A protein has these predicted regions:
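Non-catalytic, usually N-terminal nucleic-acid engagement modules in DNA/RNA processing proteins
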Residues: 2-86, 93-95, 103-104
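Eukaryote-skewed repeat-based solenoidal scaffolds used as protein-protein interaction platforms
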Residues: 72-146
């Protein structure tokens, strides 16, 4: 176990993403709370990679990650770095790291967990979150949607 100079254990698994979360019963996916979800639909939507280079006002724009994973992998690697960016936006459509039905189930579950963990984290930071409903094989649907 690695501790820094302040004797704090390094959070290499990014447990901070789900700090304060409630979890589903079996797989313990973090639950996106109802107060994180906006009442009104988005007026505008822009992909993350386009929004990063956009020099205009993003205050009425929801950011989505419907693109190749490599265009937004940087968020998963360093979520704190993008806090200020997402604060400039109207909200986030839940993350969409790829889940394919031919992936090993453990990898599907890991991707589902990352999608929900990041969505929860940014929701807790008072960003509006529109949950992204994405699961792999049908057998995973009940737990994911609980």
């Amino acid at each position: 176990m690695y501790k820094d100079k302040n004797n704090v254990v390094e959070d290499s698994f990014q447990a901070f993403l789900v700090d304060g979360a409630n979890f589903t019963k079996n797989e313990e996916y973090p639950i996106i709370e109802s107060w994180m979800i906006p009442k009104l639909p988005p007026k505008k939507i822009m992909p993350f990679d386009k929004a990063l280079n956009y020099h205009g006002d993003l205050s009425d724009v929801y950011i989505c990650t419907y693109a190749r994973d490599c265009t937004f992998e940087r968020i998963r690697k360093n979520p704190k770095r993008y806090l200020n960016f997402f604060k400039r936006c109207a909200g986030i459509i839940g993350f969409d790291y790829s889940i394919h039905s031919d992936m090993p189930i453990v990898k599907q579950k890991a991707q589902m967990n990352d999608n929900l963990s990041l969505s929860f984290y940014y929701g807790k930071q008072e960003n509006n979150i529109i949950p992204n409903i994405r699961y792999g094989i049908d057998e995973l649907a009940d737990e994911y949607l609980s």
